[in-house]
């Protein structure tokens, strides 16, 4: 990490992934705040030039490279900064502490002043970035509403960018208003003051997800020496800065340089945040900050102890991109790394290009697919950690530095990071990057991932070997999902490193995008065969949150914000609302096919003779209905809903920074961008469905990885199973108990129980609770309408004996509730029609028979599930040397809200 040199030929600073780049070099912000100062006779709120020069010289000696101001500095201050090798984060002051949006004239002046200031200072070599606002008070945000504030700041950003397109802009937020959606800005900046290291690091991890693919800047950090003491100030300020750098921020700014502080019309004398006092005498905090800045982001002594990493690149016909990939790997700053290229039977020049890099080990392997190639690299790796990336990826120089951090500081078996499309990719690839279906991460919380993409992941070598590496059945995709789920099934966790970013070249044509989605669809089918508990009705069930900037996914991920009583919470609570798959229904192939069928039927209806009268069911009176017109309207509604949503997502896609297409300008190119993005939204689910069908044709070669050594046939239910099922269906439960003269480990028994259930034939869909529910350990699906939840307990008794207890409860899913209501309506409608034609007796008989058949099928499925669980529990307990105790029914428990709320989640996973 380097500071910017004194500029001769000025090049505008730019965003470089999760960091900043100045003069074509990585620039890690090591800053201090400067001001605000008392205004002089001319209203300038900066010290005299001699004092400014003295301050800047002391800053440079303390390894500071950035000065943050809260008022617009005179050009002389910027000149002094560049003379001392400093950059300036320029703050634009305006009256944000009053309801400014209530005064249109004030809003106009704010915009004009901001645009004029940035246009005037943008070309100065000292200008690093511009802060267009700082901590709009929560009361003002509540007064105007968050959406109006967001819209104002977004429009202000766009106006300034139009006037100075190369300038970097940020808005400095703070925790009370963290819920503001300000992803348009180039840098995500936050002022944060937390005095416990664990709390600060946890909050920085959260802020990294708010920042997304943008750099995160800790814009203020430090503490008051009056209240914490001089040594306390030094310790806490150093902790703040160290945490920011090691958590992957693009920099940190210490608040403040001096105790000289003027605010609200007068000096502030009861706070002392300065690294130096008013007379510029250094405090202990200055030496602490100097040491942190000199070692940032990680001390050399710490880096020397990091483990060796083997980077494996699997390549097939990658001659177009492999050189760029290996060149970027050669620039890694990680201290101990080896690079292995597995040439997976390429027919082009991939192997020879890779051999042109002398520090790269190339292994030629017969074409066996992606997973097989990953296993070849795993076998050849000598590092303690094995990192994987793709041949069409360009890595950041500090990629490995941050990717290994979760494995160094937390109990995780692996880690992954984000991937973004390079800015220099062609326009078709830029559109593909804004379409659904691309690789992204799924987070269980701010640090633990459920899935990380295969182009950016690393694992401990021994963890991969413990599960026999990658499953070679995954030829092109799905291997990353499979490996994460298999590690989690063993109780291991996968971390996330937000600063370990790679640039991933996306498909450069619609045809290539289609082939990719078909491949993903195949992999989904095979994943369903391997991990049936992770699917419901053919749909993949994620417990975590899919992090993506795409409007397609963000539109479905609602949230609720609790800002505390009267908006006074220092750290608001933000809750993600549940996303149900019904929200994606208009994008499903079934919806599209049904809409087309209805549309075609409506158009051709007259030719097919669809002119018979329909019945008004509520009265039984005949009512003439134009059937073709009704079908046409239904088909048009379905098609326009799908097309409208695709167009909406394309319209809401972020096109900032994209170049013009050919000879077209940026403005002229936007319709073409949006049209193609909308088309990709339309074809993506169709491609996945095509892949699902192809995967089914190969499913016989996909054996479940959860089969134990002793498969067993599910039993024929007995009378006692029917009685137990009856108790379950009427709201009760069942319980079994087993006695052991020795201590029994509950986790061991549960692991065996899951294995036995998954070994049953026919196969059972078993969902293992991963910490989200306290009232169940595992669940067995009952058809598609319900769950049989099983909870276990091991009681410790005298002399090392123990009692193993299991109990089961039946709960219908949300989907079952909807289906039941639908069936009831259909039966009622059918009965009405039947009565009109055949009379009451026959109609009632048919209705009763139909309802009885449905109920009997549900009862049979419940009985069979009870029998399977009962026998499986008995097998596990007997194998552990336990003796069964007499059967006893569990007490009835009323759960009035579970079907409507909690089971909405269960129906998804």
Say what each PLM segment does.
Residues 21-188:
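Active-site mouth of glycoside hydrolases
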Residues 142, 147-247, 274-276:
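Extracellular glycoside hydrolase catalytic/binding regions
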Residues 255-305:
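Aromatic-rich peripheral "rim/lid" segments of glycoside hydrolase catalytic domains that contact
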Residues 327-336:
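Short, acidic, metal-binding catalytic loop of nucleotide-sugar glycosyltransferases
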Residues 328, 343-352, 393:
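A conserved acidic beta->alpha catalytic loop
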Residues 386:
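Short aromatic/hydrophobic "clamp" motif used to bind/position activated sugar donors
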Residues 394-429, 493, 505:
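Conserved donor NDP-sugar-binding/catalytic core segment of glycosyltransferases
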Residues 417-418, 432-450, 465:
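Short, flexible, basic/aromatic active-site loop/helix in glycosyltransferases
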